[in-house]
Amino acid sequence: MKFKQKGFSLIELVIVIVILGLLAATAIPRFLNVTEDAENASVDGVSGGLATAVGFVRAQWEVDGRRNTSVILDGTTVSLDTRFGFPTGTSNTDVTAMTDATCQEVFSSVLQSAPRNVLYTEDARDQRYTVRVLDGVGGSATGINGANVTNIDLCVYHQIASLVIDQNTGIATPAPDLNTAGAKGVTYNPGTGQVLSFTND
């Protein structure tokens, strides 16, 4: 009795391996970028949420008559500079006197369910964003009274996943700024209300 052999011949096996290799060579690079795409989408989402929240603060300020130094947003008092009407924290009312802490107050008070954040000089492990103010980097803007205000501060929110974190201290090294290589994040200008996402890939 003769048995008929079932299965792949050597040539068929080689062809299948070559085809699988070609598929892997084209698919793997796409899957390697999934993490970076997710990080970029996360930053864009936070940026959009912050821009919307800043717009809500400005709208409430307009409804309240444009001269109040604060508005109530969802039960939270949010301070603002009456020359512009955009949030400046919970107690600060000057766009040229922002601090790391007031930038953090803006982020945490206007966003509903704000991402976990910490000042850039603190342990960033188990956080999502670091917060930093860059003094005078926001440029100038014209207030509602027509006066030009210069040296407006800029709030910068860096995505921690894009930073190098010291394993011992948990602090981002070097201190993140707008030029930190590989960094991703969001900027907020309290003089213009402009919110932008950035990536330094």
Where are these regions (language model features)?
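Charge-dense, E/K-rich amphipathic alpha-helical interfaces
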Residues: N68, I72-T76
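Intrinsically disordered, low-complexity regions enriched in Pro/Ser/Thr/Gly and acidic residues
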Residues: T76-D201
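N-terminal single-pass transmembrane signal-anchor helix
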Residues: K2-S42, V46-G49
